[in-house]
A protein has these predicted regions:
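Conserved short histidine dyad/triad with adjacent acidic residue
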Residues: 18, 33-48
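Short, conserved beta-strand element in jelly-roll/cupin
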Residues: 36-37, 48-63
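A short, N-terminal "cap"/entry segment at the start of jelly-roll beta-barrel domains
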Residues: 1-30, 44
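Ligand-binding loop in jelly-roll beta-barrel domains
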Residues: 82-106
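Structural motif
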Residues: 53, 60-62, 69, 85, ...
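Short acidic-glycine-tyrosine-enriched beta hairpin
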Residues: 68-82
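Well-ordered beta-strand scaffold positions
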Residues: 30, 35, 60, 68-70
Length: 106
C-alpha cells in the first residue's frame, strides 16, 4: 500500500493529459486528488456521492456551492456536502486545489 505521494508527479500528469484533475488515493473510505484550472478553463464536475473538502493551494476565483459564490484564495478550505451542486469558476490565475472525499471518487 502506497503511503507517500509527491504532488508534483500528479500536477505533471495533469499537464500532460486532457484532464484537469488527478485522483491519487481512491479507497472505499477516502479519495484524494488535485485539480488544476487554467484561467477561464471550465470546471465540469457534477455532484458527488460523498462529502468533499477542498484546500486551495494557489490561485483565485470562486467556488459556487448551490446558489452562492465563495471567493477562492490560497490556504482557504471549503466543505461541500454530498449531492450538492458546485464548481469553480472566474479564476484569472491558474487555480490549484487539493480535494478529499469521504469515500471513493465516483
Amino acid at each position: 500500500m502506497k503511503l507517500e505521494y509527491d504532488l508534483d508527479t500528479y500536477l505533471e500528469k495533469i499537464n500532460n493529459n486532457n484532464s484537469y484533475f488527478q485522483t491519487f488515493i481512491n479507497k472505499d473510505s477516502l479519495a484524494a486528488g488535485v485539480l488544476v484550472l487554467k484561467p477561464g478553463e471550465e470546471d465540469t464536475q457534477t455532484p458527488h456521492d460523498s462529502d468533499e473538502v477542498y484546500y486551495v493551494i494557489s490561485g483565485d476565483g470562486f467556488l459556487k456551492i448551490k446558489d452562492k459564490d465563495y471567493k477562492v484564495s490560497k490556504d482557504k478550505l471549503f466543505f461541500v456536502a454530498k449531492d450538492v451542486e458546485h464548481f469553480f469558476h472566474g479564476n484569472t490565475k491558474e487555480l490549484k486545489v487539493l480535494y478529499f472525499f469521504g469515500g471513493p471518487d465516483s
